[in-house]
Amino acid sequence: VQGMMLLIVPYMAMAFGAKESTGVILPMLCMADIMAVAYYKRIADWKTVAKLLPTALLGFLVALFVDKLVPAQGFRQLMGWTLALAMAVMIWSEIFGKENRWMHKWWYSALFGLLGGFTTMIGNAAGPVMSVYLLSMRKEKMEYIGINAWFFLVVNLLKVPFQIFAWDNITWGSFSLNLLMLPVIGIGALLGIRLVKLFPEKAFRRFIQFVT
């Protein structure tokens, strides 16, 4: 569940530094994504993934540019307001049972792809962005998981060269720590698969909203 990653990010930032922690976390995310795709490989709406990826890559470039201009506090405020607005759209749809009238517009997916690419590059924090997007699109549980698994695998693998060559955040030392964490990541993946099976559709949506 991508939104739960935000529980870990602050502690990693305190331990390794805000920017440096993104390079420590990224290989672990890639490992988890590979496990998720291995299990859910046949469940994906590729049309939705394809709508998100082009502007997600643009979000990478925006993040690299803005990183030099905006302080960390500014990023947190920007992300907070963006997520609050997106959550309001989703909650309105849930309470009043109305379809999001923007969901079929080309710019809606493009906007969330851009936000996802930007927030994942800055702080590995795109989980809530994608959660809000997919829930507002009223994706069912397994479709939600399949899209998330493939989108984040592709996006996180594409981030690796940026983290190595642009920000120098991934080193042999940090990667050795990632390898030590591999068994724990595997256990977490198995628990996540089990947890998903226990949730009925409506309870799953409520759980995602809560962790987001």
Predicted regions and their residues:
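Small-residue-enriched transmembrane helix starts and helix-helix packing motifs
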Residues: 1, 103-117
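Small-residue-rich hydrophobic segments that form or flank transmembrane alpha-helices
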Residues: 1-50, 112-113, 127-185
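Small-residue-mediated transmembrane helix hinge/kink sites in multi-pass secondary transporters
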Residues: 10, 63-68, 132, 193-194
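A helix-boundary/kink motif common to multi-pass secondary transporters
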Residues: 17-18, 71, 140, 200-204
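Lipid-exposed faces of alpha-helical membrane segments in multi-pass integral membrane proteins
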Residues: 28-31, 54, 58-62, 78-88, ...
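Transmembrane helix exit motif
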Residues: 33-43, 78-104, 193-194
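Membrane-interface helix termini and inter-helical loops of multi-pass transporters
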Residues: 64-77, 97-100, 163-176, 198
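Interfacial loop-to-transmembrane junctions
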Residues: 190-211
